[in-house]
Amino acid sequence: MEIRNIAIIAHVDHGKTTMVDRILHQSNLFRDNQEVGELILDSNDLEREKGITILSKNVSVRYKETKINIIDTPGHSDFGGEVERVLNMADGVLLLVDAFEGPMPQTRFVLQKALELGLKVIVVVNKVDKPNCKPEDANEMVFELMFSLDATEEQLDYPVVYGSSKNGWMGEYYNTPTTDVTYLLETIIEHIRPARENPGTLQMRISSLDYSSYTGRIAVGRIHRGSIQMGDKVSIVQRNGELHYATVKELYLFEGLGKVKTKERIVNGEIVAIVGLENFDIGDTVADWENPEGLTSIAIDEPTMSMLFTINNSPFFGKDGKYVTSNHLRERLFKEIEKNLALKIEETASPDSFLVYGRGILHLSILVETMRREGFELQLGQPKVVAKEVEGFLHEPVELLFINVAEEFSGKVIEIVTKRKGDILNIEKKEDRVNLEFKISARGLIGLTNPILTATEGEAVVSHRFKDYEPWKGELTEKRNGALIAMETGTAIAYSIDKLQDRGKFFIDPNEDIYEGQVIGENNRQDDLVVNVIKTKKLTNMRASGSDDKTSIAPAIKFSLEEAMEYIGEDEYVEVTPKHIRLRKIMLKEHERKRQKNA
């Protein structure tokens, strides 16, 4: 049986998961009575909500005499290390674009890697049922993008499939709907070359990890050369060249949405999962027992940002979560680095705190959000960028920032970004919207999204990706306003909040429990202000002629986890529990903060 391994590249919300659902339905993988959660690929709750793929999945379908392994790629450059490993398993890629929007900035990052690896591209223009969409323009934009990424002539001669995965069809022309997605499957078989036979000694690069509480870590990868069978003795060639030996206890193939155990000998081209290996990492090679030869290892992206993770020691600790001790935190973090390779963890002088290094705010916030849902309580310090010395000079990570915004707001956006030492690279007008491209230090990105969304009335689409390390740009001048800090522990009273509204904006609602030292709002001025919001109104037995004043309180500002991480200052923590996200000063008592300031 021939095998085709194909990776899918798509921007958030361009219909990738729906398309895979359709292909699975077409090959009747669901029994008619089986309840299927829509969005099969995004298997983790967070992925479904955020619409991003974090870890790649494998799904496999059979069509005629061919087995097609569909590999999902993460669409965001924070997960860049994952992208390159996944593409190494593929023979070709499906580039999925929205007929209305065309290819988006994040897609560019993954596509560039695919072209560099010499993979054949099939372009799928999806959502052609959208009103006002321009499928031909979208295709034209893909051609320009691939041309600008130095695609070869053969790569530029790509097949195009039009369709609507929502309505369940794919065809040759966008204006003639078909009845199913057969045309897409036929195109894959015709244009993507099957894996060629590659006899010789075994070579398989470990591209991803699975974990089972029964068998431990499972190595997943594509057999590059030779063959493998249950019971084989193999060697593991690590990235640094060290050798370990192991036996293949169990071997699994991907079928449909799951894995099937096999006792057959599996030859090169197939993607397998191996149980029974120890001492391995992603990027290592599973090789022949007698003549081990390692494949060239793939560089894993270096972390660009670090954050302090520490146990929750606020006055409200232990109220919401079930995992609150430093042992819980340590175990969970060290378990995470087994499969999340772009993370690094460093112990600090305190046994309760750890420095966690990652690829960016999104990368770190996904970890925190996952832990929060598992029942952890923890606190986070201000994110800091990871600088390094190059030839004796300090260098910092620089990112490319893409902002799509309505034309009338473009001036405001440019002003906000350039204040943070961002350089404008490109302005492209598309009807009444503008695409802006900047180069900005990773420090300048922290806390940038909020002011941009405020200035554009929530209309901007912001994305960014890592570019390179460049010389340190000096201090950033822009500072946020000071904090409104709670004076006492208790319940916030509407009357007090109302009387203090002229001092700033609040992050809490009336009747919310708060503690001394909690950051409950933002001051209108640059310095911090301690306020008492648990004071009630003094009552007298005299009736006022105008009856009581009604309170009218502006709605509280509520932060998402990422926004809170970007917002806090150096002397603040984000307190994260399964039910709450609070901001607080590291030193809760005012006299301690004053003493430290004067020290």
Q: What does each of the following model-derived ranges do?
A:
Residues 225-227, 277-279, 358-364, 406-410, ...:
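Helix N-cap motif at beta-to-alpha junctions
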Residues 1-97, 101, 141, 209:
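P-loop NTPase switch module centered on the Walker A-proximal segment
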Residues 120, 130-190:
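Canonical P-loop GTPase G-domain recognition
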Residues 164, 348-363:
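Short glycine/threonine-rich beta-strand-turn micro-motifs
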Residues 35-41, 149-161, 195-205, 241-254, ...:
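Interdomain boundary/hinge elements
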Residues 203-307, 317-319, 481, 490-540, ...:
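Conserved nucleotide-binding/hydrolysis modules and their immediate coupling elements
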Residues 314-337, 550, 554:
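A short, contiguous, amphipathic alpha-helix enriched in charged residues
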Residues 254, 258-260, 395, 440, ...:
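Long insertion/accessory domains within large nucleic-acid-processing enzymes
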